[in-house]
């Protein structure tokens, strides 16, 4: 648990500057970009204390017209920006969170708004920020504050039972000239709780050099174009393989970090760098030519797993019993074959396939690839065939593709029980 909490995180940030920002900078896009690069450098500095690096991986400037309706109603603007990000921006450019920068003044004293504990979520990993000051630092701290909400942080409240007692930390409810670059203990706890509860996956991946669109800054701990390594400032760098002042490898070093970097040299070929997680995963080993562990690879589809009783599919070992347990708890088991006869009827929720409104009953050989039936606890004389159905997602409660349905056979994506050798 502690290792998971202490792991370095990377927020790959996309920033969108709207038309009002272009007008504010008199159409000088170069000047506007510089303003935004400075903001991101500050945000990255602020977050380094939490072992988070923030990298700008995309910058979009709406120089002709706004692609959403940006208004003084912050709540509405946030909702439409989130919707636009999910339906448009995410399809074009991979990133973890998107923030809007606008010169439109929001109602009341609001200078920013963001969804809380939403990092990595499709439509809510967003924030909106007003470019409310001539002082770059104050705008940067506003965006850092809104990003804090995405990462699960609520406002610091002074003199409550929580005793954050930091009136000037990043998550202070109101902005002031005394604002600092520090996070309160409350913010740190909120962030750790968010990691534990939501387990956001997207921020575990480091951006590649070429993903980062802002000019490289030696000493910001992000590996950027033109750098061989970046271990932070000369004062804080603790990596003997990297020269902090130049971001070049020290003399005789082959690497500065990586799962296959050992004491500044590439690990020997064959050194295991990622263990197999389970039957359907493959262990990876170093090549001897690189500091990186090869891409995570999976066992081939159809490879036996689960004590040779099941078969792998896309890195998972789909077991019918486990599917019952996930719906009904640890005492659940797969129902007797008689229950699966319901799937032969093709009535109600019992079928193999549904296309538009047409229901296709299962053929006798395919009945264990349709609706899943389970029993709860020990069965008496009467068996109740438990099943699950969802109006929203017709696939919920169906036997998962790749599940064994007979000896040497698995359910394919058409819910037919086919020979495992022809299924893949």
Swiss-Prot record:
Residues bound to Ca(2+) 1: 96, 202, 205
CDD domains per record: ZnMc_adamalysin_II_like
InterPro entries: ADAM_Cys-rich (IPR006586), Disintegrin_CS (IPR018358), Disintegrin_dom (IPR001762), Disintegrin_dom_sf (IPR036436), MetalloPept_cat_dom_sf (IPR024079), Peptidase_M12B (IPR001590), Reprolysin_adamalysin (IPR034027)
E.C. designation(s): 3.4.24.-
Cofactor info, note text: Binds 1 zinc ion per subunit.
Motif D/ECD-tripeptide: positions: 279-281
Entry annotation: catalytic residues: 146
Positions bearing carbohydrate: 69, 185
Residue spans crossing the bilayer: none
MF terms (GO), sorted A to Z: metal ion binding; metalloendopeptidase activity; toxin activity
Positions contributing to Zn(2+) binding: 145, 149, 155
Keywords in alphabetical order: Disulfide bond, Fibrinogenolytic toxin, Glycoprotein, Hemostasis impairing toxin, Hydrolase, Metal-binding, Pyrrolidone carboxylic acid, Secreted, Toxin, Zinc
Cofactor (UniProt): Zn(2+)
Subcellular location: Secreted
PROSITE patterns in UniProt: ADAM_MEPRO, DISINTEGRIN_1, DISINTEGRIN_2, ZINC_PROTEASE
Gene Ontology annotations for the cellular component aspect, listed alphabetically: extracellular region; plasma membrane
Subunit-level organization: Monomer.
Protein purpose: Non-hemorrhagic metalloproteinase that degrades fibrinogen. The alpha chain (FGA) is rapidly degraded, the beta chain (FGB) is degraded very slowly, while the gamma chain is left intact. Shows a prefential cleavage at X-Leu bonds. Cleaves insulin B chain at '29-His-|-Leu-30', '33-Ser-|-His-34', '38-Ala-|-Leu-39' and '40-Tyr-|-Leu-41' bonds.
Other notes: The disintegrin domain belongs to the long disintegrin subfamily.
Full protein name: Zinc metalloproteinase-disintegrin-like brevilysin H2b
Source organism of this protein record: Gloydius brevicauda
